[in-house]
Amino acid sequence: LPRAIHFDEEVMRIFQMVNLSEQISKISRIGTKGMHFVDNEDNILMVRKGSDAIGELGWQKSWYFHQPQLEKLLRDNAEKEKNFISFLGYETQKINHDSDLVSVKSYSKSLKKELVLNCKYLVGCDGANSNTSDYIGKEIKDYGLKEKFLVLDLKVDNRYNNIKNLPDFTVQHCDKVRPVTRCYISKKRRRWEVKILPSDNENEFLKSEAIWNFLGKWIEKKSAKIERSQLYTFRSIIKKKWYKNRVILAGDSAHLSPPFLGQGMCAGIRDVAALAWRLKGYANNKLSADDLVNYQAERFPHVSAFIQLAAEVGKIM
């Protein structure tokens, strides 16, 4: 299912480092027109400009994509590597460690099968509800934003005029009661992010009829198909500890950002890029365990700055 929809030039540079930038550029769209902030009457308040110009890192600054396509591309390429093994559908249940190894016990409900793996280091990239993160500790730094949004991903049919007339850029409706973000992902896909109010009946709001009544301001039901409708609680938090007993966190396991800057997945990929060379150096006896600990010292200030900025952008909405 689609989740993230945006990455930046630094992430494309990381994709280039693993020889995937050319493939990924073919399934992505450059964000040339930025984000338009409008009032309740669609008057433009501000434009955060986009561009197709190549930036300092050798790539355009903003890219939009369909996450299932990107995940398939990454997985297909990873499976070509001799040292890559995947076990899909397993959930971590217990983590143990000694001075030399980490042991991970997982279970697949669909296969009704237990799996135990032993490793030198375990990297927990298991998302916002991370069991690995809980193992390391629950202390967080909270920057205060906690808001519910309904995220709607639609596949649209461009044969209809109401779809053709949609803007080819992202629009932020700065409504003080119910902010709405309309994202232009590609010619075939659009996203709406709608704030849920305390007075809303969430079960009613999630019904198909209610969703289409809301979307009717912009599109007709016959011209689009809802691929996903999901309630999210947007948070602005970062774990205080990312490392314990040979277990390391990366991505949403370590931090959660509101999506208002499109930097959530970017932060996770930066984490992995900062961690990968350290793990390789350690495995080749060129780095010490202290160099792995320094991973958090490198990433924490950068991630926390972006989370705080995203929370501030949320206030503008």
Where does each model-flagged region fall?
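Active-site-adjacent segment of FAD-dependent monooxygenases/related oxidoreductases
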Residues: 2-79, 173-174, 183-185, 307
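Short, conserved active-site loop motifs that form the nucleotide-linked donor/cofactor pocket
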Residues: 35, 84-85, 247
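Helical substrate-recognition/capping region of FAD-dependent monooxygenase/halogenase enzymes
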Residues: 39-42, 50-57, 72, 76-81, ...
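Conserved mid-domain beta->alpha element of the FAD-binding
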Residues: 74, 124, 226, 232-313
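A conserved beta-strand/loop element that lines the FAD pocket in flavoprotein oxidoreductases
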Residues: 78-92
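Core beta-strand elements of the Rossmann-like FAD/NAD(P) dinucleotide-binding domain
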Residues: 111-121, 125, 244-246
